[in-house]
Amino acid sequence: INSVMDRLDGIENVDMVIGGPPCQGFSVAGKMDVNDKRSQLIWSYVKVISKVKPKAFIMENVKALGLLEKWKPIREKLLSELRHLGYTVNFMILNASDYDVPQARERIFVVGIKGNCNNVPNWEEMIKHYSHKAPTVREALQVLDKAGHGNNPSTCRAKITLASNPILRKSPYAGMLFNGLGRPTRIDGYSATLPASMGGNKTPIIDEKELYENCAPWIVTYHDEIMKDPSKAAFKEAPSFLRRMTVEEAAILQTFPIEYEFCGSQSSKYTQIGNAVPCNMAKAVATRVINVLNGEENVIFKPTEHNLFDFSYAES
């Protein structure tokens, strides 16, 4: 990224910069190493802001950066530097399930508006206007065919085996009941956060009988059984109706359009999906920033042909 910084010099009249600097160095799912090179990229983001001086910016990152005491000095320095550049900065933690995303995924958003914006309402309250009750996993996946067929063509063949020494929690959807990091998916609720590490035995698990035949979730029965008698846990293959979540299913749970195409290997596709900000969540935040820039509640924003997304929304 340092090699392209000079190309930003002289760019003017930028409306908005949107980005999510790589977060593995801050994530509880990663090594949480402040010296991780990827952790330094938040400062590259600040440098981009200082060079192009947009009217507004949106930065997304993992919840840990916003909450953990370990990252407090980083957090305070980040906000201080952005404010020093002349921005009114708001910092918030949002849950994707509040924004029409069938996933319990919490992330921080740092939103900055150039100049003094004391008259701007509370951001979280503003964004709640775009809040919609999310569909369940079952409801969201109804748009797809069965795994391996039609518009859901991919499959993940990583074997699913039960752990002989499971890590038990009160919920069957927490802990570690299987070998590997893939956890069972709550079909009639929200998915857990889809990680960038998906692929192989780190891919979430789907109960096909529950999803397609409305059977009771097998994992609940099994969890109850070994909670009562842990000796019943054994290393063995899981029932055949348990399988890994497909690329297409993961994309739907991140609210990508069904026709959206990902490039690269299957492993790369899982990573792209897990790293992404859920589309509906991004829309809610970006739309509100556009409102502020336009000074109006109705939004009509037509990006150029080079933009990936076309926002055209109006509040009812």
PLM region descriptions:
Residues I1:
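SAM cofactor-binding core of SAM-dependent methyltransferases
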Residues V4-V14, F26-T193, G199:
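Class I S-adenosyl-L-methionine
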Residues I18-G19:
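Non-cysteine beta-strand/loop elements that form the S-adenosyl-L-methionine
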Residues P22:
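Short glycine-/small-residue-rich Rossmann-like dinucleotide-binding loops
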Residues A158-S316:
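C-terminal target-recognition/interaction regions appended to catalytic cores
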